[in-house]
Amino acid sequence: EGICRFKLVSSGTVLSLYRTAVQCTPDRPLYPLSEPPGFSARLAELVGPYATVGMPSDMDGVRRGIVDLDTFTQDAYANWQQQVEMALGLIAERTWDLLFLHLFTIDNAQHLFWKYQDPLHPGYDASLGVAYRTEIERAYRWVDAQLGRLIEQIGDDTTVIVVSDHGGVPIYRLVYLNAWLASGGYLVPREHVRAGQAARLDWDRTRAAMYGTGSIWLNVRGREPRGSVEPGAPYEALRDEIARALLAWRDPETGESVVVQVLRGEQVYGGNTGGGPDLVPALRRGYGLGRGEGLGRVMAGRPLIVSNQSPWSGGHEGPYLPSDVGGVVVLWGPGVQEGDVPARAALCDIAPTVLSLLGMSAPGVIEGRSLLD
C-alpha cells in the first residue's frame, strides 16, 4: 500500500498526467519509518499523507526532463509546508528537549533556478528569467517566514539554531575528472561504449579513479581488491604526480586553472581514514562535476570540460573550497548575545553546541567545539 500525488499537466489531444514517486504509507508502512515506530503515523494525523522516503521533491524528474519547473515547485512547496506544519503541531503538543527540522527549500532553488537570475550563466534565458529569476529569493523569503512562525510558537525561553551545511555557487562549466584521469593514463576503461555513455573500469590497469563528488582513490595493492599501485614510495610518488597535474590543468576555452587546491585525504578527514580518499581536489568556483562518473565510471567520447546546459545550474558539491560555499549559522535565545558566534564557525561545531545546550559534555573524540564556550 502506497501514496502519491497526481497532477493533470495537459488535457488536449494528448493527455499528460504527472505522478509523484509512490511512497510508503506513514500509518501502515511496509517497514518502520520512525523510532518509535508509531511516530510516523502520529505525523500523518497532524498533516495527512506525506512523503516518507528519500528527497521530498522530484529533483531527478526535473533533471531528466520529466517534470516541468512549475509542477516541481507546486509539489515541492506542498511537501515543505507539510514539514513545517509537522513541527508546529509537535511544538503545540508538548515541550521537547530537542526538535530538528530539515528543509531543502533553498538548496533545491539554487540547484535549479540559478541560471534564470544569472546573465553570465550559459543556460541563461532572458525570456524565462522573467518567470523564474526570483525563485531563489522566494525560497529565502519563504524559509524566513516559516522560521518566524516557529519562533513565535516556541516562545522566548528556547534556543533556536539556524544552520545550513553549505552555501551555493553557479556552475558554468562541467568537468569530467575520470575522463581527465584516463587522458593522463591513470585510469583505463574496461569496455568500449558509445560517446556520452559511462564505461566501467579495467582495475588491473587503473591506478586512480574518482568516486562520489570529486575525491580520488588510488588503486593500492593490499587495500583494494585488484590493486595495481604498490604502497609506500610508489604510492606517495603517484599522489604527488596526480596532485601536480591537477593543479596544472587549464580550461582551453577560458585559460583558467580548473583545480585551485589539492589536499591529501588525511589533511581533510580525521579519525580512521584508512578507507578514505587519497586526494581531495577543490574546483574553481564556476566549475562543477559532470554527471555519470560518480560511481567509478568514465564518460566516453566527451570533452574533459563542457559548457553547462543542464538543468542543474547551481550547486555546492564541487568539490569546492569551504570559503566558496560557506553556509549560515544563527543562534537566538536566552543568554545568546550579539557577537557570541565566531566569524569562522564550522559545521562540526554544531553538535558540541547542541550538547552544551542540553547540559551534556561532548565525547572526547568529537571534532569541533561549542559556539557558546
Enumerate the language-model features and the residues they cover:
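Cytosolic regulatory/linker segments at or just downstream of nucleotide-handling modules
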Residues: 364-373
